[in-house]
Amino acid sequence: MKSEKLKRGLLVALVWLLILGLWEGAYRIFEWRCYVFPAPSHVFDSLVNLIGFKTWFGDPVWAVDAAGHSVAFQMNPNWPLHGQPLQLTGSLWNSQLPAAVGTSILRLLLGFSISVVLGLFIGLAMFRFKFIDALLGPVFLGLQTLPSVCWVPLAVLALGINETGILFVTVMGSFFSIAITLRDGLRVTPTIYRSAGLVFGAHGIKFYTQVMLPAGLPALASSLRSGFSFAWRSLMGGELIFVLKQEGVGHLLAVGREFGDVGQVVGVMFIMVLIGMAADRFIFAPLEKKVQSRFGLGG
């Protein structure tokens, strides 16, 4: 089993390396305008610059004559470091990218925690009380489809351009999904759990804390997984527009846009995707799988 997973992982890595190699090779052959669509080397240079180093892998590999044509098999003496040693300018952890990632993760943890608490209580309420479900269910479904950046103007006008505004956008963009997913998951909870709980005297608060909440763990795990993705997208949308003292990953994307650095734009987008994939792969997917396996729901 482990060998199969290793082979699959190596195959995936090989395919991606092939794609990147073809992409870089096409740029070197056709030499399109890199400020319109960057090659992987330009993206690499931009990301390295954001962590305090300086490289020029995107420069021509071959020397260039007076007419601007490449001289085959004659290396460019300035590639890839312009004759300078590779050295860190400043502190690694205080450089732009690590500092921005740390800021965004702290904001995400706070906003996502609030979303989980709100989604948990409102999701349980919609499951328990038909009136609340009829009142809030359709509205929450509609608000769940609303792009998170639509909350930004309201946040700016009501709360100002500050950390509270970004927190508001993050929470409003994610907790509807958590509440709806939890409610729908609780609805398909086997009725035998409820009946057994009532038979053994679980009433009132105990019914929810000792019966429904444990029985609803598969639904809760699924709601956390979907809610995280909504929270991360909402936070990135808010940081893209809000300009604060503490710069997040979304702000680096906005800076790349303002300065026309398409390499930085693509590189920061890659970091956004990488963080989301890592959180899902190493936290939420294993959590959901473990809970489903515990309740005999795993495939």
Regions found by a protein language model. Give the residues of each.
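Transmembrane-helix boundary motif in ABC transporter permease subunits
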Residues: 110-140
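Loop-to-helix entry region at the N-terminal start of transmembrane alpha-helices
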Residues: 99-108, 157-178, 264-271
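Transmembrane alpha-helices
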Residues: 168, 172, 204-238, 267, ...
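Short cytosolic juxtamembrane segments of multi-pass membrane proteins
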Residues: 285-299
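Short cytoplasmic-facing helical segments at TM-TM junctions of multi-pass membrane proteins
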Residues: 178-223, 249
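Hydrophobic alpha-helical transmembrane segments of polytopic membrane proteins
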Residues: 248-287
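Periplasmic/extracellular loop-to-transmembrane helix junction in inner-membrane transport proteins
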Residues: 29-113
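Generic hydrophobic transmembrane alpha-helix motif, especially the helices
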Residues: 137-177, 184-185
